[in-house]
Curated annotation (Swiss-Prot):
It comes from Danio rerio (Zebrafish). It catalyses: alpha-D-glucosaminyl-[heparan sulfate](n) + 3'-phosphoadenylyl sulfate = 6-sulfo-alpha-D-glucosaminyl-[heparan sulfate](n) + adenosine 3',5'-bisphosphate + H(+). During somitogenesis, first expressed in polster and presumptive forebrain. During mid-somitogenesis, expressed in eye, hindbrain and anterior spinal cord. During late somitogenesis, strong expression in eye and hindbrain, decreased levels in midbrain and anterior spinal cord. At 24 hours post-fertilization (hpf), expressed in neural retina and lens, brain and anterior spinal cord. At 36 hpf, retinal expression is confined to the ciliary marginal zone and there is strong expression in tectum, rhombomeres and otic vesicle. This is Heparan-sulfate 6-O-sulfotransferase 1-A. Its main location: membrane. It is a single-pass type II membrane protein. It is found in: Membrane. GO terms for molecular function: heparan sulfate 6-sulfotransferase activity. The gene is hs6st1a. Residues 37-413 are lumenal. Glycans are attached at residues 262, 318, 329. It comes from the Eukaryota. Its EC number is 2.8.2.-.
Amino acid sequence: MNLLTGRNMVERSSKFLFIVVGSVLFMLILYQYVAPGMMNFGSPHGYMLEDDADLFPTPDPHYVKKFYFPIRDLERTVDFEIKGDDVIVFLHIQKTGGTTFGRHLVQNVRLEVPCDCRPGQKKCTCYRPNRKETWLFSRFSTGWSCGLHADWTELTNCVPGVLNKKESRMKNQRKFYYITLLRDPVSRYLSEWRHVQRGATWKTSLHMCDGRTPTPEELPPCYEGTDWSGCTLQQFMDCPYNLANNRQVRMLADLSLVGCYNMSFIPEKKRAQVLLESAKKNLRDMAFFGLTEFQRKTQYLFERTFRLKFIRPFMQYNSTRAAGVDLDNDTIQRIEELNDLDMQLYDYARDLFQQRYMYKRQLERREQRLKNQPLFPFRRTSSSDSTFRDDAPESEGSRLPTEDYMNHIINRW
């Protein structure tokens, strides 16, 4: 009798244990089935991959690639050591939205030790967590230490020496990660014209190259007097020395290759070709670049490149001074001709940017699927993977003139 009673108790315990285990497994599978995207088992570097689904647009499955880029040009994840000697260097091209992005770098990055930005001061202190040395070289951290809107030629020759002087010691082990923003050339050109029309000059820019600044003969002014305020668009376009023409190519290229600002160094056609190819190479080799017209994708690529997370999402604002300019087709064509090198560079950069975004998103999703597959083989694909699309402001097919959005962002913050 006792033997039968013991056997019954064992059978009941086994059944109870089976029911409990089965219920737990069923609930886990059901949870994954009805609520995919709700569970996160700790993505690397603090990324909430599933939560990002609503923030970052899906790559266009119908996007047609224009250029071939090997994997080494698409993969842009760097081992940025903020506690080491690594430095991010921001090359700020005029009227590309760089003011907004620069503010993001000093005010909107989630850091162990945030940048110290005090009211009334133009610069923030961005120290490493473990010592009083800067990890960021930019307008809002170190100021215009290499000159106002210093270009690639100036920065690469100036930054190491400036940091050695600031930190009072020589360092040969620093890694410099150059970053920049590009913008649709016509929109950028119009924005610069409106800025100059209001009195901006940038005449304190050094334009240092091969150890010297350009002579007045090499770089004649477009106007007489203190500024060019009130100039018409026609006057702006008519000046052959206007640095607004092809500004993005000039600021990204190695000017030493073409004799700096000496136009007689090599023939004009050869000079243009060398500048364009140099700008493409330097852009391709940079740790990161973004496009003003694609704020969310720019945020995504920066975060994945440096494994740094922004606190608040980037906003896409398209109501700018450039947007309010009504132009006829002839004027637009003339601006495109004056900025032919920039048009070619932007076409190249936009394709590289989109391919990098697609590559990184696909890689991330593959990693997520592999991570979830062993645990939940019956998991249904998240509907968010196929339903969310590019947000309207990041339209692929139209020109979206965007520039400095800080007033909007400050109000929202």
